[in-house]
Amino acid sequence: MFENLSDRLSKTLRNITGKGRLTEDNIKETLREVRMALLEADVALPVVREFIAKVKESALGEEVNKSLTPGQEFLKIVQRELEKAMGEANESLNLATQPPAVILMAGLQGAGKTTSVGKLAKFLRERHKKKVLVVSADVYRPAAIKQLETLAQSVGVDFFPSDVKQNPVDIAKSALADAKLKFYDVLIVDTAGRLHVDTEMMDEIKQVHAALNPIETLFTVDAMTGQDAANTAKAFNEALPLTGVILTKVDGDARGGAALSIRQITGKPIKFLGVGEKTEALEPFHPDRVASRILGMGDVLSLIEDLERSVDREKAEKMAQKFKKGDDFTLDDFREQLIEMKKMGGMMSMLEKLPGAKNLSEHVKNQVDDKMFVKMEAIINSMTLKERANPDIIKGSRRRRIALGSGTQVQDVNKLLKQFDEMQRMMKKMRKGGMAKMMRGMQGLMGGGLGGLGGLGGMFKR
């Protein structure tokens, strides 16, 4: 997320953090570099001008130079102003109304609006325990109705049927009546997208808005369109009262111009980030956490939240009890660990949220391939129950059969078994001898046995 901007800013700010005193002369070059980094990230010019002016004013203030580490204070100022540009605090959905709370979704074609409806429905059902109904009022694209129906089934929410022959306003009214009748907590209405903001589109959505009187009107924009995303949202907001923005395709946006421009140009908060194609890939937008990630400081809070949501407490407790009793760590246990890792978005997703992840060498980053976990799981799935319980019996012919069944090579099976053997030994060391032995075990595991994770052993040496 925002790799180019993050790399450029981290490199620029590293040069000033050691300064003993900040003067107009020694911050001039740094501010010029920051300005260039923001413009290259496609941040809107008025936003860049205001940002630079505020950073300069604060950096030359008396309090900063009274500090023992003015360079570090400068970094804090940049972080604070980044947060302010994006909205300072997380603004969650407002559902404080007589149920059903209606959420109207709008956006241009191809921005990921319908997918965002499915993600939002899943988010509300799983994290807020809401009974959700979704409906498509997009009568211009038959595939949109079918797409939303399929999404609704996959995320476990109800779908209100609609047809291309119906009027969008009639669809909206019927869905609202049904939501009231069946005591739904939330109704999410998907509307038609267009290639650009036009009068016909605005008139239609105004009518739908008037019929529903939604408590939330969210505009979905593609992060990769940069400041154009902010300008489109502004034009839309002038015709319809938006309450917030969902920024999609953030995982593919290396620049970050949209995230830094939207709040100041539209006056509306970013409420969610779409960070992938999967239905769980929707994150509440926290300006402070995003600013921290942009500056290479990681996002530990989000990582902890991911862990709390993804880890099955019951399974974790069983594993802990098994470990205490001294039972063997089996290949089935290993597979469970791989599944938990996948649920959290994979190793790379976790690494990106750790402080200092930006300083990892490209060699290490290239070694972390999340497809590797899929391959490892497939190999274990191709084993019989007996083989999983007794990996020592897996010799030549069995290894060839497992490789064939999992669509992998024999050397992949060999690597996995070697890695598993080292994990077993590490578990035994942990039972016998505490943290020092555990760290040495982990170093050995990550240094050689993990195949694709080879270079990560260096993390424990720094």
Swiss-Prot record:
GO MF, any single term: GTPase activity
Binding site for GTP: 107-114, 190-194, 248-251
Domain of life: Bacteria
GO cellular component: signal recognition particle
Top EC class of this enzyme: hydrolase
Compartments, as annotated in UniProt: Cytoplasm
Keywords, in A-Z order: Cytoplasm, GTP-binding, Hydrolase, Nucleotide-binding, Ribonucleoprotein, RNA-binding, Signal recognition particle
SMART domains the UniProt entry points to: AAA, SRP54, SRP54_N
Classification via Pfam families: SRP54, SRP54_N, SRP_SPB
Enzyme nomenclature, EC number: 3.6.5.4
PROSITE patterns, alphabetized: SRP54 (PS00300)
Database matches in InterPro entries: AAA+_ATPase, P-loop_NTPase, Signal_recog_part_SRP54_M_sf, Signal_recog_particl_SRP54_hlx, Signal_recog_particle_SRP54_M, SRP, SRP54, SRP54_GTPase_dom
One annotated GO biological process: SRP-dependent cotranslational protein targeting to membrane
Catalytic reactions on record: GTP + H2O = GDP + phosphate + H(+)
Coiled-coil annotated spans: none
Family under the similarity heading: Belongs to the GTP-binding SRP family. SRP54 subfamily.
Subunit structure: Part of the signal recognition particle protein translocation system, which is composed of SRP and FtsY. SRP is a ribonucleoprotein composed of Ffh and a 4.5S RNA molecule.
UniProt remark on domains: Composed of three domains: the N-terminal N domain, which is responsible for interactions with the ribosome, the central G domain, which binds GTP, and the C-terminal M domain, which binds the RNA and the signal sequence of the RNC.
Job description of the protein: Involved in targeting and insertion of nascent membrane proteins into the cytoplasmic membrane. Binds to the hydrophobic signal sequence of the ribosome-nascent chain (RNC) as it emerges from the ribosomes. The SRP-RNC complex is then targeted to the cytoplasmic membrane where it interacts with the SRP receptor FtsY. Interaction with FtsY leads to the transfer of the RNC complex to the Sec translocase for insertion into the membrane, the hydrolysis of GTP by both Ffh and FtsY, and the dissociation of the SRP-FtsY complex into the individual components.
Protein name (record): Signal recognition particle protein
